[in-house]
Amino acid sequence: MQLKEIIENNAEVVSDQILRVDSFINHMIDPNVMMEIGEEFARRFRDDKITKVLTIEASGIAIGLTTALALRTPLLFAKKKVPSTLGDSYVSNIYSFTKNESVTVSVAKQYLKSDDKILIVDDFLARGEALKGLAHLVKQADAELVGVGIVIEKAFQGGGKALRDAGVRIESLIKVSSLEGGKLHLEE
């Protein structure tokens, strides 16, 4: 996969906690990279009979769409504001350390059912707060969380380990071991 080279050549280390990938993943999107990401997640979860891909707006939508296309299944994204038109919904609170704020996310109950087999996808996994919030939506619906696909896991922030220890299957395409000294260090 060319993703590793793209990240090594284009990602910007902002601090020892923050990696910026907005030139190809979460601001300006390279569709070829997104298709490759979606196809790789589909390959890893192809035999799991996924019925829906779940993500969070906005950064997860492109990743979710290409994954859903490759799996030939619907994409459902959690909304960060509960619109008045949403009706009966599952709701979860998520704290963002990057933005230093809490956000309420929601999914309409009519789109997340107890017989669903869910694959959650997102761009980053750091402390795991977004994933915990999305998993909480799945649990409220009594649906099955089959696994999680992450483009970039900041392994040094511990979210992935905690979720794996809790029994969640996580497939990360890239694992960052450190951003110390302004340098990107990847796990092999």
From Swiss-Prot:
Q: Which UniProt keywords apply?
A: Cytoplasm, Glycosyltransferase, Purine salvage, Transferase
Compartment(s): Cytoplasm
**Residues that coordinate or bind xanthine:** L19, N26, K154
Pathway listed for it is:
Purine metabolism; XMP biosynthesis via salvage pathway; XMP from xanthine: step 1/1
Q: Describe the function of this protein.
A: Converts the preformed base xanthine, a product of nucleic acid breakdown, to xanthosine 5'-monophosphate (XMP), so it can be reused for RNA or DNA synthesis.
Q: What is its EC number?
A: 2.4.2.22
Q: Which Pfam families match?
A: Pribosyltran
Q: Does the record carry Glycosyltransferase as a key word? A: yes
Name listed for the protein in its UniProt record: Xanthine phosphoribosyltransferase
Q: Which residues bind 5-phospho-alpha-D-ribose 1-diphosphate?
A: A126, R127, G128, E129, A130
Which GO terms fall under molecular function for this chain's record?
Answer: xanthine phosphoribosyltransferase activity
Asked whether the UniProt record includes Protease among its keywords, one would answer: no
Q: Which family does it belong to?
A: Belongs to the purine/pyrimidine phosphoribosyltransferase family. Xpt subfamily.
Species this chain originates from:
Desulforamulus reducens (strain ATCC BAA-1160 / DSM 100696 / MI-1)
What superkingdom heads the lineage?
Answer: Bacteria
Q: Which reaction does it catalyse?
A: XMP + diphosphate = xanthine + 5-phospho-alpha-D-ribose 1-diphosphate
